[in-house]
Amino acid sequence: MNPILIDLGFITIHWYSIMILLGLFIGGSLIIRESKRFKISEDYIFNLIFLTIIFGIIGARLEYVIFEWDQYSNNLLGIIKIWEGGLAIHGGIITGLLCMIIYTKKYKVNTWNILDITVVGLIIGQAIGRWGNFFNSEAHGPATTLEFLQQLHLPKFIIEGMNIYGTYYQPTFLYESIWCLIGFIILLFFRRRYYCKIGQPVAFYFIWYGIGRFFIEGLRTDSLMLGDFRVAQLISIGLIITGIIIMVVKSRGSKLKNRYNDLENTNEIRF
Protein backbone atom coordinates (compact mmCIF):
# COMPACT_ATOMS: atom_id res chain seq x y z
CA MET A 1 0.00 0.00 0.00
CA ASN A 2 1.44 3.35 -1.07
CA PRO A 3 1.28 5.75 1.93
CA ILE A 4 1.71 8.80 -0.32
CA LEU A 5 -1.29 10.38 -2.03
CA ILE A 6 0.52 13.15 -3.92
CA ASP A 7 4.25 13.74 -4.39
CA LEU A 8 5.07 16.97 -6.22
CA GLY A 9 8.69 17.03 -5.17
CA PHE A 10 8.44 20.22 -3.13
CA ILE A 11 5.46 18.89 -1.20
CA THR A 12 4.32 15.40 -0.25
CA ILE A 13 0.80 14.64 0.93
CA HIS A 14 0.39 11.40 2.90
CA TRP A 15 -2.81 9.39 3.14
CA TYR A 16 -2.27 9.24 6.90
CA SER A 17 -2.54 13.02 7.18
CA ILE A 18 -5.63 13.08 4.95
CA MET A 19 -7.46 10.50 7.07
CA ILE A 20 -6.56 12.27 10.32
CA LEU A 21 -7.75 15.61 8.93
CA LEU A 22 -10.94 14.02 7.56
CA GLY A 23 -11.66 12.53 10.98
CA LEU A 24 -11.06 15.88 12.66
CA PHE A 25 -13.30 17.69 10.18
CA ILE A 26 -16.25 15.31 10.44
CA GLY A 27 -15.91 14.91 14.19
CA GLY A 28 -15.55 18.66 14.70
CA SER A 29 -18.58 19.37 12.50
CA LEU A 30 -20.74 17.06 14.63
CA ILE A 31 -19.50 18.73 17.82
CA ILE A 32 -20.34 22.19 16.48
CA ARG A 33 -23.78 21.03 15.34
CA GLU A 34 -24.60 19.54 18.75
CA SER A 35 -23.24 22.55 20.63
CA LYS A 36 -25.77 24.81 18.89
CA ARG A 37 -28.57 22.90 20.63
CA PHE A 38 -27.08 24.03 23.93
CA LYS A 39 -26.71 27.68 22.87
CA ILE A 40 -22.92 27.49 22.88
CA SER A 41 -21.39 30.23 20.74
CA GLU A 42 -19.32 29.21 17.73
CA ASP A 43 -16.36 31.25 18.99
CA TYR A 44 -16.29 29.30 22.24
CA ILE A 45 -16.60 25.87 20.67
CA PHE A 46 -14.16 26.68 17.83
CA ASN A 47 -11.50 27.74 20.32
CA LEU A 48 -12.17 24.68 22.45
CA ILE A 49 -11.91 22.30 19.48
CA PHE A 50 -8.75 24.00 18.19
CA LEU A 51 -6.95 23.86 21.54
CA THR A 52 -8.09 20.30 22.20
CA ILE A 53 -6.83 19.14 18.80
CA ILE A 54 -3.44 20.79 19.34
CA PHE A 55 -2.95 19.36 22.81
CA GLY A 56 -4.46 16.03 21.73
CA ILE A 57 -1.92 15.64 18.92
CA ILE A 58 0.92 16.67 21.24
CA GLY A 59 -0.20 14.14 23.84
CA ALA A 60 -0.66 11.36 21.30
CA ARG A 61 2.79 11.99 19.84
CA LEU A 62 4.39 12.40 23.25
CA GLU A 63 3.17 9.01 24.47
CA TYR A 64 4.45 7.31 21.33
CA VAL A 65 7.86 8.99 21.46
CA ILE A 66 8.32 8.25 25.18
CA PHE A 67 7.75 4.52 24.72
CA GLU A 68 9.71 4.40 21.45
CA TRP A 69 12.57 6.65 22.59
CA ASP A 70 15.25 4.37 21.14
CA GLN A 71 13.81 5.16 17.72
CA TYR A 72 14.12 8.94 18.22
CA SER A 73 17.06 9.42 20.60
CA ASN A 74 19.43 9.86 17.66
CA ASN A 75 16.82 11.34 15.34
CA LEU A 76 15.16 14.23 17.18
CA LEU A 77 13.90 15.76 13.93
CA GLY A 78 11.83 12.63 13.39
CA ILE A 79 9.72 13.52 16.43
CA ILE A 80 7.83 16.18 14.47
CA LYS A 81 7.17 13.95 11.45
CA ILE A 82 3.73 12.85 12.58
CA TRP A 83 2.58 12.36 8.98
CA GLU A 84 4.71 9.20 8.95
CA GLY A 85 2.57 7.73 11.73
CA GLY A 86 3.21 7.29 15.42
CA LEU A 87 0.26 8.73 17.34
CA ALA A 88 -0.86 6.92 20.50
CA ILE A 89 -4.55 7.77 20.86
CA HIS A 90 -4.64 7.26 24.63
CA GLY A 91 -2.09 10.02 25.12
CA GLY A 92 -4.25 12.29 22.98
CA ILE A 93 -7.37 11.43 24.97
CA ILE A 94 -5.64 12.26 28.25
CA THR A 95 -4.15 15.61 27.18
CA GLY A 96 -7.29 16.54 25.26
CA LEU A 97 -9.38 15.79 28.33
CA LEU A 98 -7.13 17.91 30.54
CA CYS A 99 -7.36 20.76 28.02
CA MET A 100 -11.17 20.63 28.08
CA ILE A 101 -11.31 20.54 31.87
CA ILE A 102 -9.03 23.57 32.21
CA TYR A 103 -10.80 25.49 29.43
CA THR A 104 -14.31 24.87 30.76
CA LYS A 105 -13.29 25.70 34.33
CA LYS A 106 -11.71 28.95 33.15
CA TYR A 107 -14.96 30.10 31.54
CA LYS A 108 -17.18 28.50 34.21
CA VAL A 109 -18.93 26.12 31.83
CA ASN A 110 -20.31 22.70 32.85
CA THR A 111 -17.40 20.38 32.07
CA TRP A 112 -19.52 17.23 31.94
CA ASN A 113 -21.89 18.80 29.43
CA ILE A 114 -19.01 19.74 27.13
CA LEU A 115 -17.46 16.27 27.40
CA ASP A 116 -20.80 14.68 26.51
CA ILE A 117 -21.09 16.91 23.46
CA THR A 118 -17.59 16.10 22.21
CA VAL A 119 -17.37 12.31 22.64
CA VAL A 120 -19.60 11.59 19.64
CA GLY A 121 -17.30 13.65 17.42
CA LEU A 122 -14.26 12.01 19.01
CA ILE A 123 -15.31 8.42 18.43
CA ILE A 124 -16.30 8.94 14.78
CA GLY A 125 -13.02 10.79 14.27
CA GLN A 126 -11.20 7.74 15.62
CA ALA A 127 -13.16 5.44 13.31
CA ILE A 128 -12.04 7.48 10.31
CA GLY A 129 -8.50 8.20 11.51
CA ARG A 130 -7.73 4.49 11.89
CA TRP A 131 -7.70 4.23 8.11
CA GLY A 132 -4.52 6.25 8.15
CA ASN A 133 -2.88 3.20 9.73
CA PHE A 134 -4.11 1.11 6.81
CA PHE A 135 -2.35 3.31 4.27
CA ASN A 136 0.81 3.32 6.40
CA SER A 137 0.71 -0.49 6.69
CA GLU A 138 0.85 -0.27 10.48
CA ALA A 139 -1.25 -1.10 13.55
CA HIS A 140 -1.97 -4.53 12.09
CA GLY A 141 -2.42 -7.86 13.82
CA PRO A 142 -0.51 -11.13 13.55
CA ALA A 143 0.32 -12.88 10.31
CA THR A 144 -2.58 -14.76 8.77
CA THR A 145 -3.59 -16.35 5.49
CA LEU A 146 -5.33 -15.11 2.38
CA GLU A 147 -8.10 -17.63 3.03
CA PHE A 148 -8.78 -16.14 6.48
CA LEU A 149 -9.13 -12.63 5.07
CA GLN A 150 -11.39 -13.87 2.29
CA GLN A 151 -13.64 -15.54 4.87
CA LEU A 152 -14.17 -12.10 6.44
CA HIS A 153 -15.72 -10.99 3.12
CA LEU A 154 -13.46 -7.95 2.99
CA PRO A 155 -13.20 -5.73 -0.09
CA LYS A 156 -10.37 -6.70 -2.41
CA PHE A 157 -8.41 -3.48 -1.78
CA ILE A 158 -8.27 -4.18 1.97
CA ILE A 159 -7.08 -7.75 1.43
CA GLU A 160 -4.41 -6.51 -0.97
CA GLY A 161 -3.43 -3.77 1.48
CA MET A 162 -2.91 -6.32 4.23
CA ASN A 163 -0.34 -8.10 2.09
CA ILE A 164 2.76 -6.45 3.51
CA TYR A 165 6.05 -7.57 1.96
CA GLY A 166 4.51 -10.86 0.91
CA THR A 167 2.81 -11.71 4.21
CA TYR A 168 -0.87 -11.26 5.03
CA TYR A 169 -1.81 -9.71 8.38
CA GLN A 170 -5.03 -9.32 10.35
CA PRO A 171 -6.58 -5.85 9.79
CA THR A 172 -6.81 -4.77 13.44
CA PHE A 173 -7.12 -1.18 12.23
CA LEU A 174 -10.42 -2.23 10.64
CA TYR A 175 -11.60 -4.03 13.78
CA GLU A 176 -11.12 -0.85 15.80
CA SER A 177 -12.63 1.36 13.11
CA ILE A 178 -15.79 -0.77 13.03
CA TRP A 179 -15.91 -0.92 16.84
CA CYS A 180 -15.75 2.88 17.01
CA LEU A 181 -18.38 3.21 14.28
CA ILE A 182 -20.77 0.97 16.23
CA GLY A 183 -20.05 2.99 19.38
CA PHE A 184 -20.78 6.18 17.45
CA ILE A 185 -24.19 4.90 16.36
CA ILE A 186 -25.06 3.74 19.88
CA LEU A 187 -24.01 7.11 21.33
CA LEU A 188 -26.22 8.98 18.86
CA PHE A 189 -29.25 7.13 20.20
CA PHE A 190 -28.08 6.91 23.82
CA ARG A 191 -27.71 10.63 24.36
CA ARG A 192 -31.17 11.27 22.90
CA ARG A 193 -32.81 9.07 25.54
CA TYR A 194 -35.15 11.09 27.75
CA TYR A 195 -33.49 9.89 30.95
CA CYS A 196 -29.89 10.18 29.73
CA LYS A 197 -28.05 12.16 32.40
CA ILE A 198 -25.18 14.58 32.07
CA GLY A 199 -21.93 12.64 32.25
CA GLN A 200 -23.35 9.33 31.05
CA PRO A 201 -22.41 9.74 27.35
CA VAL A 202 -18.74 10.28 28.20
CA ALA A 203 -18.93 7.38 30.69
CA PHE A 204 -20.29 5.14 27.93
CA TYR A 205 -17.46 6.23 25.63
CA PHE A 206 -14.81 5.35 28.22
CA ILE A 207 -16.34 1.91 28.79
CA TRP A 208 -17.05 1.12 25.14
CA TYR A 209 -13.73 2.24 23.71
CA GLY A 210 -11.80 0.77 26.64
CA ILE A 211 -13.31 -2.69 26.15
CA GLY A 212 -12.80 -2.72 22.40
CA ARG A 213 -9.25 -1.40 22.50
CA PHE A 214 -8.24 -3.81 25.28
CA PHE A 215 -9.05 -6.89 23.20
CA ILE A 216 -7.95 -5.48 19.85
CA GLU A 217 -4.63 -4.36 21.34
CA GLY A 218 -3.99 -7.97 22.32
CA LEU A 219 -3.83 -8.83 18.62
CA ARG A 220 -1.51 -6.04 17.54
CA THR A 221 2.15 -6.65 16.82
CA ASP A 222 3.38 -3.08 17.34
CA SER A 223 2.13 -2.35 20.86
CA LEU A 224 3.93 0.15 23.06
CA MET A 225 5.24 -1.81 26.04
CA LEU A 226 5.83 -1.06 29.70
CA GLY A 227 7.85 -4.03 30.83
CA ASP A 228 5.76 -7.07 29.99
CA PHE A 229 2.52 -5.10 29.73
CA ARG A 230 0.92 -3.38 26.76
CA VAL A 231 0.49 0.32 27.56
CA ALA A 232 -2.79 0.62 25.65
CA GLN A 233 -4.30 -2.27 27.59
CA LEU A 234 -3.32 -0.76 30.94
CA ILE A 235 -4.85 2.59 30.00
CA SER A 236 -7.94 0.85 28.60
CA ILE A 237 -8.50 -0.84 31.96
CA GLY A 238 -8.28 2.60 33.57
CA LEU A 239 -10.83 3.97 31.10
CA ILE A 240 -13.26 1.11 31.78
CA ILE A 241 -13.03 1.51 35.56
CA THR A 242 -13.37 5.30 35.30
CA GLY A 243 -16.35 4.96 32.97
CA ILE A 244 -18.15 2.54 35.29
CA ILE A 245 -17.61 4.82 38.29
CA ILE A 246 -18.90 7.87 36.38
CA MET A 247 -21.91 5.93 35.08
CA VAL A 248 -22.86 4.74 38.58
CA VAL A 249 -22.39 8.15 40.20
CA LYS A 250 -24.29 10.01 37.48
CA SER A 251 -27.16 7.49 37.62
CA ARG A 252 -27.99 8.36 41.22
CA GLY A 253 -30.88 10.60 42.17
CA SER A 254 -34.09 11.43 40.36
CA LYS A 255 -34.37 10.46 36.70
CA LEU A 256 -35.77 13.93 36.01
CA LYS A 257 -32.73 15.83 37.30
CA ASN A 258 -29.45 16.60 35.51
CA ARG A 259 -30.75 15.27 32.20
CA TYR A 260 -28.48 15.72 29.19
CA ASN A 261 -31.36 16.90 27.00
CA ASP A 262 -32.82 19.35 29.52
CA LEU A 263 -32.44 22.32 27.16
CA GLU A 264 -34.97 24.49 28.98
CA ASN A 265 -32.46 25.20 31.74
CA THR A 266 -29.56 25.84 29.38
CA ASN A 267 -27.96 29.28 29.56
CA GLU A 268 -26.31 30.75 26.49
CA ILE A 269 -22.54 30.28 26.52
CA ARG A 270 -20.46 32.97 24.83
CA PHE A 271 -16.72 33.38 24.45
Feature roles, as predicted:
Residues 1-271:
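A feature for loop-to-transmembrane-helix boundaries and adjacent hydrophobic helices
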